[in-house]
Amino acid sequence: MATENASVPEFILAGLTDQPGLRMPLFFLFLGFYMVTMVGNLGLITLIGLNSHLHTPMYFFLFNLSLIDFCYSTVITPKMLVSFVSKKNIISYSGCMTQLFFFLFFVVSESFILSAMAYDRYVAICNPLMYTVTMSPQVCLLLLLGVYVMGFAGAMAHTAFMVKLTFCADKLVNHYMCDILPLLERSCTSTYVNELVVFIVVGIDIGVPTVTIFISYALILSSILRISSTEGRSKAFSTCSSHIIAVSLFFGSGAFMYLKPSSLLPMNQGKVSSLFYTIVVPMLNPLIYSLRNKDVKVALRKTLSRSSFS
């Protein structure tokens, strides 16, 4: 992903805390979070793959959301866990740039897959008669391609400018992962261009999906209020409320971290904020989308009954 930097061949990740008494409790806490994330997302991927009645556009995007959450949790959490049990959590320069690239690829992809899911719900609720035509397999694949293209473009933009920087001899990165802002703090050269890229690219990666989602849900809310059936209105609200919770957690914590002036957000507070979109959201997404979802519950019962009779 990147050649070694002549000034700094490696970094030391500070981790989440420097208090020895908190390290082991935090290790087991985040190990538990990671296991729940893995089981939840792999379970949802398996359920969607094995049950044909879930092979719809909504679950096509949910399948990819779970895949993204699984992947970027795997990019971040294992290295974070190492920081709790080792004196120095060392990561090579190339390893750091690789982690940065894949973290950004998956996190940007998630922001756009959430907007694709909002559009899917808009079509399903506001134009149900045109749903199968509008959300055809070809359209779904094009939307998914757009999601991953935006993820690649965002990750490449940040990483390409990051590898051009010269880093200071102080190798300590005040974070539990290689993220943009803590790495910029370690640069001995001007970071003006990088900060401009952060402002533009993050603005697009948060702004465009957020506007898309808000417009979609404003139209959905307007349509729901016109539904005469109480049961139909309740079902529509139930379907959308879970998505709104996930979106609020993800974009709220991301915007708080990246779009606030660094002078107003000390890095230690930034680490806590980043826990929401790196650890908490990937863990909660399978629960949010499945606990109140009748289709997923039916699929789980069918899968368990098949396995018990096999």
UniProtKB/Swiss-Prot annotation:
Q: For this chain's UniProt record, which GO biological process terms are given? A: G protein-coupled receptor signaling pathway; sensory perception of smell
Transmembrane segments in this chain: where? Answer: 28-48, 56-76, 99-119, 141-161, 196-216, 239-259, 271-291
> What Gene3D superfamilies does the record tag this protein with?
Rhodopsin 7-helix transmembrane proteins
- Coiled-coil region: none
Kindly list the cysteine pairs connected by disulfide bridges. Answer: C96-C188
CDD domains hit by this protein: 7tmA_OR8B-like
Q: Which Pfam families match?
A: 7tm_4
Which ranges make up the Cytoplasmic topological domains here?
49-55, 120-140, 217-238, 292-310
Q: Which residues lie on this side of the membrane: Extracellular?
A: 1-27, 77-98, 162-195, 260-270
UniProt subcellular location: Cell membrane
Task: Keywords in alphabetical order, please.
Answer: Cell membrane, Disulfide bond, G-protein coupled receptor, Glycoprotein, Membrane, Olfaction, Receptor, Sensory transduction, Transducer, Transmembrane, Transmembrane helix
Glycosites? N5
A GO cellular component annotated for this chain's UniProt record is:
membrane
Q: Which GO terms describe its molecular function?
A: G protein-coupled receptor activity; olfactory receptor activity
Primary location: membrane
What membrane topology term does the record carry?
A: Multi-pass membrane protein
Query: What's this chain's function?
Result: Odorant receptor.
Q: Which family does it belong to?
A: Belongs to the G-protein coupled receptor 1 family.
What protein name is recorded for this chain?
Olfactory receptor 8B8
